[in-house]
Swiss-Prot record:
Pfam families: HGTP_anticodon, TGS, tRNA-synt_2b, tRNA_SAD. Homodimer. GO terms for molecular function: ATP binding; metal ion binding; threonine-tRNA ligase activity; tRNA binding. Catalyzes the attachment of threonine to tRNA(Thr) in a two-step reaction: L-threonine is first activated by ATP to form Thr-AMP and then transferred to the acceptor end of tRNA(Thr). Also edits incorrectly charged L-seryl-tRNA(Thr). Binds 1 zinc ion per subunit. Keywords: Aminoacyl-tRNA synthetase, ATP-binding, Cytoplasm, Ligase, Metal-binding, Nucleotide-binding, Protein biosynthesis, RNA-binding, tRNA-binding, Zinc. The keyword ATP-binding applies. Disulfide bonds: none annotated. One of its GO terms (biological process) is threonyl-tRNA aminoacylation. Residues 1-58 form the TGS domain. The keyword Transferase does not apply. This is Threonine--tRNA ligase. Zn(2+) binds at C328, H379, H505. It comes from Chlamydia trachomatis serovar L2 (strain ATCC VR-902B / DSM 19102 / 434/Bu).
Length: 635
């Protein structure tokens, strides 16, 4: 007999029992898609060992959902091969919104989707058991996939000692690490979304492939809800709204590097000004470090060795330089400009740094995935004893910032990876427990992702939920035990000795560009007044009303209200529609009556009309709405 633990409960099982046997014993096997066995993702068919700790995964768990979608990608490949036997499957990973599979020697269009979906449904209904097999060696794997040069190339690149596995469902076998569902049966709702071209390994010099995107769910109801969400997402697409509202544009001369227009810069500046006020109140000092620094710096930080392919490099005066992809190394150099004592800690240093990272052209997407962006970093230097309290301070800052935008969020604690980490076991345990205690004290929901931390320390990721319930990973809090050592940072401790500080690296917006894209979609372009690129538009009925309109515009502008005048020859109704299409918060119409009474006729973008409003009253209401950072209109 063996003894295992699941949900802090002990179970006794016969030798050779699998995770599925344990699930059956718990009478919940129908709910489970996979398992974490000693923090490692495994199939339910995995044989358990004495002393194992098991955590079952369901569709509702992020890792469980990945397993479900991964199996769905295999179903897609199997369906395509049944219909087009000469197609060559390459890779089929899980992505944020579903999965895709790339094929060579295949030419299809979306007109073929119904046939593929019908075949996928058949495969699911056939309830094929999914089994894992391990090749005895690399030669055996290469021999099996000798007719597929893409799979053979992947196998050839693997180290000799790596276990090479494949998964079988019915007649289909695919090279894969897994894990997978126990069978194809749970995939009851399957939908293909689109196709695109792709290059093998993202390299334009390599073979051209066709990529098929899809989603899947355990129930038809969930699929319908998801498709409805996708339709709503199309209406909110920040790339479309960004153009319509004249916020930003993309130019072919600089792919992945957006041009912000005057209206977009108003929103940008409102975000940055708010960020600066928030951080000044929280005790942060702001710095600015260069964008261009030499190779020596990036060798110390480790970027030159491990990240160079994502950096823009150049040679100046026969010396190698790189445009910074991250702000951290520059802050390390700033720290070293002065001597430091434990009495200064926590030392909070913030920077909105302009960074550049080379992304493949196929990965670029509006403001969400770019090659240049501004990261709102901060580095907090502290002693090990201060980690918990300072993490809680940062979490409170997170709550205030996202609350200002009406955004809900959840937190994810990623713990120590199995291999390749730095730092002692004791320091990792101290750091992880400190972050965990801070999360508990914050009273915000969080999940733990075992083994998903960085090599230099545990981290907390912040996942924001928008108006249509999509989640976006924005901010992060990372405990870094690596860079302070690499840069030989020191402080004088309470005993008068030199010590290396612990560093909390955190970003709240993450990327300002990406956060702005999220806000455009969250608000559907209808920004609250304090973020709006145009607070008020004054509309004239006739030419004789323009002088009064300009007088009012000057009055409002001097108060800090962003205002414009539309004295064009368009009809009043057309001017109002134009303003509403541009999501102007308030419109003021000036006609003969308003000219005579000096009162205002105000219309909101939701078409609420308020007549005979005094200028002073309107000004007071608007200024208070701006000051309070209100998310709802005051009129």
């Amino acid at each position: 007999m063996i003894h295992v633990t699941c949900n802090q409960e002990a179970f006794e099982l016969p030798e050779g029992a699998s995770a599925m046997d344990l699930a059956n014993k718990m009478k919940q096997s129908h709910c489970f898609v996979g398992a974490l066995i000693n923090d490692q993702e495994k199939d339910l068919s995995t044989t358990l060992q004495d002393g194992d700790t098991v955590l079952f995964l369901t569709w509702d768990d992020p890792k469980g959902r990945e397993i479900f979608l991964h199996t769905s990608a295999h179903i897609l490949a199997q369906a395509v091969l049944r219909l087009w036997p000469s197609a060559q499957p390459t890779i089929g990973p899980v992505i944020d919104q579903g999965f895709y599979y790339d094929f060579a020697n295949l030419s299809i269009s979306e007109e073929d989707f119904p046939a593929i979906e019908a075949m996928a449904k058949t495969i699911a209904e056939e309830k094929f058991p999914i089994s894992r097999q391990v090749f005895p060696d690399k030669e055996a794997a290469l021999a099996y996939f000798s007719q597929n040069p893409f799979k053979a190339e992947l196998i050839a690149e693997l180290p000799e000692e790596v276990e090479i596995s494949a998964y079988t469902q019915g007649e289909f076998l695919d090279l894969c690490r897994g894990p997978h569902l126990p069978s194809t049966a749970p995939v009851k709702a399957f939908k293909l979304l689109r196709t695109s071209s792709a290059y093998w390994k993202g390299d334009p010099s390599r073979e051209s492939l066709i990529r098929i995107y899809g989603v899947s769910f355990p129930t038809t109801k969930e699929l319908k809800e998801h498709l409805h969400q996708l339709e709503e997402a199309k209406k909110r697409d920040h790339r479309v709204l960004g153009t319509k509202l004249d916020l930003f544009s993309q130019q072919t001369c600089s792919a992945g590097m957006p041009f912000f227009h005057p209206r977009g810069m108003v929103v940008w500046n409102a975000l940055v000004d708010y960020w600066k006020r928030l951080h000044q109140r929280a005790g942060y000092q702001q710095i600015q470090t260069p964008q261009l620094m030499n190779r020596e710096l990036w060798e110390i930080s480790g970027h030159w060795e491990n990240y160079k392919e994502n950096m823009y490099t150049l040679t100046v005066d026969e010396e190698d330089y790189a445009i910074k992809p991250m702000n951290c190394p520059g802050c390390m150099l700033y720290y070293k400009t002065q001597l430091h004592s434990y009495r200064e800690f926590p030392l909070r240093i913030a920077e909105i740094g302009h960074v550049h990272r080379h992304e493949l052209s196929g990965a670029l997407s509006g403001l969400m995935r770019v090659r240049t962006f501004h990261q709102d970093d901060a580095h907090v230097f502290l002693t090990p004893e201060q980690v918990e309290e300072e993490t809680l301070n940062i979490l409170n800052l997170v709550s205030e910032l996202y609350g200002t935008f009406g955004l809900e969020y959840h937190l994810e604690l990623s713990t120590r990876p199995e291999q390749g980490t730095i730092g002692s076991d004791d320091l990792w345990e101290l750091a992880t427990e400190a972050l965990k205690r801070a999360l508990v004290k914050s009273q915000k929901p969080f999940i733990i992702s075992p083994g998903e931390g960085a090599f230099y320390g545990p981290k907390i990721d912040i996942h924001v939920k928008d108006a249509i319930n999509r989640t976006w990973q924005c901010g992060t809090i990372q405990l870094d035990m690596f860079l302070p050592e690499r840069f030989d940072l020191k402080y004088t401790n309470a005993q008068g000795e030199k010590s290396t500080p612990i560093m909390l690296h955190r970003a709240l917006f993450g990327s300002i560009e990406r956060f702005l894209g999220i806000l455009i979609e969250h608000f559907k372009g209808r920004f609250p007044l304090w973020l709006s690129p145009e607070h008020v538009r004054i509309i004239t009925v006739a030419d004789r009303h323009e002088a009064r309109a300009q007088e009012l515009a000057k009055h409002f502008s001097q108060m800090g209200i962003i205002v414009s005048v539309d004295s064009s020859n368009e009809s009043v109704s057309k001017k109002i529609r134009n303003a509403q299409n541009m999501q102007v918060n308030y419109m003021i119409t000036i006609g003969d009556k308003e000219l005579e009474t000096h009162l205002l006729a105000v219309r909101t973008r939701d078409n609420r009309v308020l007549n005979d409003i005094a200028v002073e009253q309107f000004s007071h209401v608007i200024l208070e709405e701006l000051r309070s950072l209100s998310l709802t209109p005051s009129l």
